[in-house]
């Protein structure tokens, strides 16, 4: 299952940032990144598909969703891209690292399974400290990837407990879906 087979959903990404940020007490980038990673892993385990389809980079503090990070850098003002989509109307960044949601997430953008996985992740990991969630995110998928490289979806699927047969089925489904896109 190659990362190129997974299609990133920017609309779900922005709504997921809002959804998670509205449910966390500590809304720093690190916490949001990890909550999204665990939600994607859970959804992959339960449904064979990620929610956002972002590319997770193995960084020092754990997996980082690269496109979500790009979105937040646009809002923060340190991106080479400008805010052409009104992202700053959805959320702000304070003190370089805290996400302030300026509206609620549009729940119509999610399936029930998306919301279930996001809620599971918030409920399971939301109260953890920086060090605790960092340690939990330093899983085999993260450890088996070179620093600053993309963690393969196959590694994430294996970390979620899927076996080779499940991964092969998901790969075939993704290929079929791509031909209809």
What are these regions (language model features)?
Residues 1-181:
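Domain-edge interaction signal
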């Amino acid at each position: 299952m190659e990362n190129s087979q997974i299609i990133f959903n920017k609309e779900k990404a922005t709504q997921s940032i809002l959804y998670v940020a509205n449910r966390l007490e500590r809304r720093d980038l690190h916490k949001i990144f990890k909550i999204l990673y665990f939600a994607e892993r859970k959804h992959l385990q339960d449904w064979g598909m990620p929610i956002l389809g972002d590319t997770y980079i193995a960084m020092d503090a754990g997996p980082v969703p690269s496109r979500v990070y790009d979105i937040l850098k646009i809002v923060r003002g340190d991106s080479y891209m400008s805010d052409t989509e009104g992202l700053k109307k959805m959320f702000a960044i304070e003190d370089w690292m805290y996400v302030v949601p300026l509206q609620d997430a549009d729940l119509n953008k999610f399936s029930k399974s998306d919301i279930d996985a996001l809620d599971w992740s918030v409920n399971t990991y939301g109260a953890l400290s920086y060090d605790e969630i960092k340690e939990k995110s330093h899983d085999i998928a993260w450890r088996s990837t070179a620093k600053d490289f993309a963690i393969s979806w196959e590694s994430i699927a294996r970390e979620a407990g899927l076996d080779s047969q499940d991964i092969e089925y998901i790969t075939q489904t993704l290929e079929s879906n791509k031909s209809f896109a």
